[in-house]
């Protein structure tokens, strides 16, 4: 399966798992936004510390604007393979196409590590 047009770089499975773990921890001890509307608003307001986008979203247009918006606002973003797993990490019973970490809480160190690895991946992709 080819990757969606909005996916700008590949994320290794171990990093994707760390991202989901960071979302879980931030949900419990910090603050997150769930879903594309809330995520978009958090990015536009400059509140997001990390944006997480699922790569299995249909239609792609639902999240296609997020990578560009994040780059414009200088907010790091990363991909996870499953909207269902992202929804579960957010504490939802349903899938989530995207989410944003606003306050990482106890996930601060994990978030810093993720952002560093994402910058390295983006450097390789360009």
Swiss-Prot record:
Molecular function GO labels: ribonuclease P activity; rRNA binding; structural constituent of ribosome
Residue pairs linked by disulfide bridges in the UniProt entry: none
Lineage: Archaea, Thermoproteota, Thermoprotei, Sulfolobales, Sulfolobaceae
Keywords: Cytoplasm, Ribonucleoprotein, Ribosomal protein, RNA-binding, rRNA-binding, tRNA processing
Subcellular location: Cytoplasm
Alphabetized InterPro entries for the sequence: eL8/uL1-like, Ribosomal_eL30-like_sf, Ribosomal_eL8-like_CS, Ribosomal_eL8/eL30/eS12/Gad45, Ribosomal_eL8/Nhp2, Ribosomal_eL8_arc
Protein name per its UniProtKB record: Large ribosomal subunit protein eL8
Pfam family, one: Ribosomal_L7Ae
Main location: cytoplasm
Gene3D superfamilies for the chain: 3.30.1330.30
Highest taxon of source: Archaea
Function: Multifunctional RNA-binding protein that recognizes the K-turn motif in ribosomal RNA, the RNA component of RNase P, box H/ACA, box C/D and box C'/D' sRNAs.
Source species: Sulfurisphaera tokodaii (strain DSM 16993 / JCM 10545 / NBRC 100140 / 7) (Sulfolobus tokodaii)
GO biological process: ribosome biogenesis; translation; tRNA 5'-leader removal
Gene: rpl7ae
